[in-house]
Amino acid sequence: MSEKLFKLQGEFIEKFPADFMEAVRRQAGKRNGGVKSMLKFMKRSAKGVRAPHEKATAGMETVRMAVPEEVVIPMSMHIGAPARPVVQKGDQVMAGTRIGEAGGFVSANIYASVSGTVKEVIDSFRMVNGTVCQAVSIVSDGKQRLDPSCKPPAVSDKKGLLEAIAASGLVGLGGAGFPAHVKLAADTIDTLIINGAECEPYLSTDTREMLECSETILSGISAVMKFCGIGRCIIGIEKNKPECIRLLSSLTEQIQGVSVRPLPMRYPQGAEKTLIETCTGREVPQTAASGKAGIPADCGCVVMNVTSVSTLGKYLKTGIPLISKRLTVEGNAVAKPQNIEVPIGTLYRDVI
């Protein structure tokens, strides 16, 4: 019977590693309720796997990288329409100067991450994921002069907050790159979930954000809850980050509607739908009432990465748009593993 079930699972089964399949076979081989036990085991395991953590850099403070000689900033680093370049060769720019205008509602403004001179507007720039888009190459002057237009926005309501977020160029910093102002536009949201799971092996960027920037995390959360009319916020953090859990639990203890939820240590715990179900018990519907694919707002939730909401907090305080990103540089080939903050558009060769 078990072999028949394996064949029925087809490609689904083949994707699992050998040690997992051996565990399934052992479970199916039990005399009492073998097939039922096997199916329960597979359902439980389908919620995630226990991947090695490899978080050697979790205790290392973030180091700011020296300004590179050149950056190449793609106009399509986000989900949605590419931004349109608004500079040309020879233009002088400062850190925070807008160089790309959002190409639609689902798009993002893009800013110079260094001060210097536009070397070239590249028509066909191939990204690491294989996609091709326009990009702006800037030769740095090494001074990191900040554009005087970078001033804290005045926000008094939801419309103003969404406009400020759109102006900042903020997109999801957990990997998806979805424009944040679009995600928060829905009126059906009653629960804000902050994703601090960071379930991927090696990465420690969100861990360092929680430990180093808790103030701006909370100010970003406060702004979203206040202006979007959201009454509940759950900060989800995997249990392998006890220091983060303790810190944010103590800081939110007296904040109404905000709580910290320790999460199971499994991959992909930080996946949006998995996180929503773990934190709230709700499920994102496959199909919304409109007939389109369901989204978190259809079950009353919105998920923001912990670094994304912290970046929002920083923008509301300083007016500096999204121009840098923390990276974890780790692995057997790395002589000095570390967490570094780099200007957007920094080349891999300069990071390594």
Where are each of the predicted segments found?
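Gly-rich Lys/Arg/Thr-decorated short loops/hinges at beta-loop-alpha junctions or inter-strand turns
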Residues: 172, 192-206, 333
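Short histidine-centered loop motifs in beta-beta connectors
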Residues: 83-92, 96
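Short hydrophobic beta/alpha edge segments that flank linear recognition/processing sites
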Residues: 93-107, 122, 133-139
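Hydrophobic alpha-helical positions that pack around
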Residues: 24, 231-352
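N-terminal, Lys/Arg-enriched amphipathic/low-complexity engagement segments
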Residues: 34-86, 137
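Histidine-anchored nucleotide/phosphate-binding helix
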Residues: 211-227
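Acidic low-complexity segments
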Residues: 120, 125-178, 186-187, 242
